[in-house]
């Protein structure tokens, strides 16, 4: 597995997917996307085996993710995948997590910008530290949030606020995100890691297949594809 993403399964049924590139604010290069694919495959196997009953997506360091690493575009240009296939591969790194049949919870500390925000949106729930800040910055570079953000964000915050974030690259702080429904809980900074993990462990102790089916059973979730 890529060392940029770490998957761990604990005895209490919590599987943890950790972005592990703190020196780069967990910017997403090709290795991160490869690691997300590998981590999701391992999580799926553990779920099927009954050893993982809920997933926590977190990050090492002071940021959840600053977004795409600019090197990713050079890596694509020098690779042998057609652009459409490459974009589909990146999208599937997030969709694979979203499609897991147990609850998937993102724990956001610091910035979740661009692709980082889009990864958080792929989770079924989002927990935030008080210093969390979420944004889709793609408009600043004449890009679109094409890793599922344009589909998932309106489901979460509504069309108007989604347009605001997507068109203006507005940075949304934790309290505003909570008011908008962009995050579901803001947890204390001093024990954010422990509290967020305890929340996921509580989910893991419950009827996780039923809980995990809730996001996929929503009529809004069936109205559009991220592709």
Over which residues does each language-model region extend?
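Conserved CoA-thioester-binding segment of acyl-CoA-metabolizing enzymes
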Residues: 1-60, 81, 95
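Glycine- (often His-adjacent) and acidic-residue-rich active-site loop
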Residues: 4, 59-95, 112, 142, ...
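Terminal peptide-recognition signature
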Residues: 17, 21, 35-36, 57, ...
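A secondary-structure boundary/capping signal
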Residues: 21, 58-60, 66-69, 107-109, ...
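Charged catalytic carboxylate motif
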Residues: 31-35, 89, 96, 195, ...
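Crotonase-fold acyl-CoA enzyme core
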Residues: 95-211
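Generic secondary-structure signature for well-ordered alpha-helical cores
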Residues: 201-209, 216-226
């Amino acid at each position: 597995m890529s060392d940029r993403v770490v998957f761990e399964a604990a005895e209490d049924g919590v599987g943890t997917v950790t972005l592990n590139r703190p020196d780069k604010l967990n910017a997403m290069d090709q290795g991160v996307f490869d690691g997300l694919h590998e981590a999701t495959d391992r999580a799926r196997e553990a779920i099927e085996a009954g050893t993982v009953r809920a997933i926590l997506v977190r990050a090492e360091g002071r940021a959840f993710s600053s977004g795409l690493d600019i090197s990713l575009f050079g890596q694509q240009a020098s690779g042998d995948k057609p652009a459409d296939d490459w974009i589909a591969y990146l999208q599937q790194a997030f969709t694979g997590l979203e499609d897991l049949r147990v609850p998937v919870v993102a724990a956001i500390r610091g910035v979740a910008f661009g692709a980082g925000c889009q990864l958080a949106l792929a989770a079924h729930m989002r927990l935030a530290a008080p210093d969390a800040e979420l944004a889709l910055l793609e408009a600043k570079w004449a890009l679109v949030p094409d890793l599922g953000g344009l589909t998932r964000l309106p489901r979460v915050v509504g069309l108007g606020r989604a347009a605001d974030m997507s068109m203006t690259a507005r940075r949304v702080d934790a309290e505003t995100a909570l008011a908008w429904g962009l995050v579901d809980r803001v947890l204390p900074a001093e024990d954010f890691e422990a509290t967020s993990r305890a929340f996921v462990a509580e989910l893991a102790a419950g009827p996780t297949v039923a809980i995990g089916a809730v996001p996929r059973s929503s009529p809004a979730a069936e109205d559009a594809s991220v592709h």
